[in-house]
Amino acid sequence: MQKILIANRGEIAVRIIDSCRAMNIRSVAVYSDEDRNALHVRHADEAVYIGESAVEKSYLNGNSILNAALNCKADGIHPGYGFLSENAQFARDVAQAKLTWIGPSAESMESMASKIEARKLALEHQVPVVPGVVLAADAVPDLEKIGSLGLPLLLKASAGGGGIGMREIHKVEDLDSAIAQGRSQAQRQFGDGSLLIERLLSGARHVEVQVIGDLHSHLLHLHERDCSLQRRRQKLIEEAPAPGLSDDLRKQLQSAALRLAGAVDYHSVGTGGFLVQGDTFFLLEMNTRLQVE
């Protein structure tokens, strides 16, 4: 590739521009009204205006970004993280425009975007999952089956992420209202009212494994990190390597992350997230993007 458009701003855009420069690839920044004098704009070889300050009219405007890439004759688009980085349809649009999407395939993203689909894939590839019940958007909840998981429970929006769409359930009598509220919120915020109800693993550690794959089905892990120190399910500090894990458990986590990535023919950088309790672990999710940290 000779020229890459970076569909992002801030630190990540600057870092991608630096990498392009080191590889003798021309970089194209994009900007909105409020970003026209930002560092990433001044740092890039070229810069293109993509819309008004509201992100819906600029950094989340796939058509504007795609047109900018075509007009400046870029060879590919790097989404960075956030914004359109996990938008499978945008990735598909980029590929259909005969440009290179610098990220995982649309199919990989779609498979992992749904916690329910990710759970199904995990079970098929011997990756442990937390005991739970899948609840389709229009399904009548089997309260007896859900209650048999034991309390407390954690209700998750299937299409949610970043800690959004989660609620704890500590009383059986709260199940009905929690499910109704959870479905309503999930449908409103994510367009999908499907839920996943799992046993809440109190005190479990949050450990992630970074993976990277190429277009020839080669996959590697870049070891693990502990992300347990959080506020409102948002990570504050990460520590690598994760302390206090046995060598055997460390290898099991790394192997599970690679199996999950291989299940969707993953290429690009991604992250397998796991809950670790004692010597056991369970899949949490897979992030199909460059890790923010």
Please report, for each region that a protein language model flagged, where it lies by residue:
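N-terminal beta-alpha lobe that positions the nucleotide/phosphoryl donor
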Residues: 1-272, 276-293
